[in-house]
C-alpha cells in the first residue's frame, strides 16, 4: 500500500487519524479508538519514503535538521491532512489528522445557539479550549464560516499549519501559515494590527508574546478567536495569567477582564450507537460577575458563576453532559467518564 491508498482507506473508514510507525502495521483512530490495519508491518525505509514523497524541499530540510516537522497536505477530491512527521525508537513515524474538505456549520455540529452570537461579536477574545483531538479546529472553522456568511469584513487566520480552507464569501479571508507565510504567530499578530482585520483567528496561543498580542488586538477593537490546550474555563484563565511574570499579573488580569467574551471548553464523547462522537461544552461568558472574578483573582469561584449563569447562555460541562444523556445521544456511563463530578451520573 502506498500513502495515497492508506489515506483513502483511512478516510473511507471515517478515521480521524492515520498513524505510520516503523516496525508496526499502519493504524487508524476511529471514534476515539486506535485500530491496526490488516496489512504487514512497515519498516523504517518504507515509512521514511512515504513521508518524503509528500514533503517539499523545505519540509524535508526541517525534518532532517530538527527530526520532526508539521505540515499540511491535500489529496485532491479526498481531504486535507495535518501531518506531524517524527522519529521514534524503531525509526520514522508520522501522524495524519484528517481535515474534512467541507466546513460543517454550527447547526450540523449541534453547537449551542450562543456560538452563532459569539461569532458575530464586534470585538473581544473568544477562546475555544480542550485537549488535542477534541474538535477545537472544527468548532472554530464553523464559527469563522458563520461570520463569513453573515457579515462583511476582513478575517485573518494565523495557523500552523492551515487546516480548513475558507472561501471569501461576505468576508475577505486571508489565511497565513506559520513557517511558510510568516515566521511566527507573534510576528503575524504584530503585522495583523496593520492589515485592517475585523477578526483574527490565532491557531495556538502558546507563548507569552502571542498571548499578549492577542489580548492587545482584542482590546483595540478586533474580534480574536484563539485556542489553548486547557480543559476548563478556570484552568484557561489560570494558564493565561501564569504565563506572565508576577509584576505583570495584576495588569494582565485587568486586560483579560476587559477583553474576554467567552471561553468554550469542549470534549468529545462517543455517541450511544458507537458510530461517531458528539461534543460536550463548558461555556463561560464575560459577564460582569465573571469579569469581576478575573480582576479579583477569584478563579476558584468561576465554576459556581457558570452554574448560576444559565440565563446568560452559560453551562458547566456536567450540565452539557446531562443534556446529551437526556436527549439519548450518549450513555450515562460515557457521561460519568467525562464528568467533572462523576457522582452527578450514578449507575
Sequence positions of predicted segments:
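Short, flexible helix-loop junctions that flank or precede catalytic/ligand sites
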Residues: 1-347
Amino acid at each position: 500500500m502506498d500513502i495515497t491508498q492508506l489515506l483513502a482507506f483511512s478516510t473511507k473508514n471515517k478515521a480521524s487519524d492515520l498513524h505510520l510507525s516503523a516496525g508496526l502495521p499502519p493504524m487508524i483512530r476511529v471514534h476515539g479508538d486506535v485500530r491496526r490495519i490488516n496489512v504487514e508491518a512497515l519498516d523504517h525505509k518504507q515509512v521514511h519514503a512515504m513521508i518524503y514523497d509528500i514533503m517539499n524541499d523545505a519540509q524535508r530540510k526541517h525534518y532532517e535538521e530538527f527530526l520532526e516537522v508539521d505540515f499540511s497536505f491535500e489529496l485532491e477530491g479526498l481531504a486535507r491532512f495535518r501531518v506531524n512527521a517524527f522519529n521514534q525508537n524503531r525509526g520514522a513515524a508520522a501522524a495524519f489528522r484528517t481535515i474534512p474538505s467541507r466546513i460543517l456549520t454550527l447547526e450540523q455540529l449541534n453547537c449551542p445557539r450562543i456560538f452563532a452570537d459569539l461569532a458575530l461579536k464586534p470585538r473581544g477574545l473568544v477562546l475555544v479550549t480542550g485537549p488535542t483531538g477534541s474538535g477545537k479546529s472544527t468548532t472554530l472553522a464553523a464559527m469563522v464560516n458563520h461570520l463569513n456568511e453573515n457579515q462583511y469584513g476582513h478575517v485573518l487566520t494565523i495557523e500552523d499549519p492551515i487546516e480548513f480552507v475558507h472561501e471569501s464569501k461576505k468576508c475577505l479571508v486571508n489565511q497565513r501559515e506559520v513557517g511558510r507565510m510568516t515566521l511566527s504567530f507573534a510576528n503575524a499578530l504584530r503585522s495583523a494590527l496593520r492589515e485592517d482585520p475585523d477578526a483574527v483567528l490565532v491557531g495556538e496561543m502558546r507563548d507569552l508574546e502571542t498571548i499578549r498580542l492577542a489580548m492587545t488586538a482584542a482590546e483595540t477593537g478586533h474580534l480574536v478567536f484563539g485556542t489553548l490546550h486547557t480543559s476548563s474555563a478556570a484552568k484557561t484563565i489560570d494558564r493565561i495569567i501564569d504565563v506572565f511574570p508576577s509584576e505583570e499579573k495584576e495588569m494582565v488580569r485587568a486586560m483579560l477582564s476587559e477583553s474576554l467574551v467567552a471561553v468554550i471548553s469542549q470534549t468529545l464523547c462517543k455517541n450511544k450507537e458507537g458510530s461517531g462522537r458528539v461534543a460536550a461544552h463548558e461555556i463561560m461568558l464575560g459577564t460582569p460577575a465573571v469579569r469581576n472574578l478575573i480582576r479579583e483573582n477569584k478563579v476558584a469561584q468561576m465554576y459556581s458563576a457558570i452554574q448560576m449563569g444559565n440565563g446568560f447562555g452559560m453551562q458547566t460541562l456536567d450540565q452539557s453532559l446531562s443534556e446529551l444523556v437526556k436527549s439519548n445521544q450518549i450513555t450515562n456511563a460515557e457521561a460519568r467518564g467525562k464528568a467533572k463530578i462523576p457522582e452527578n451520573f450514578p449507575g
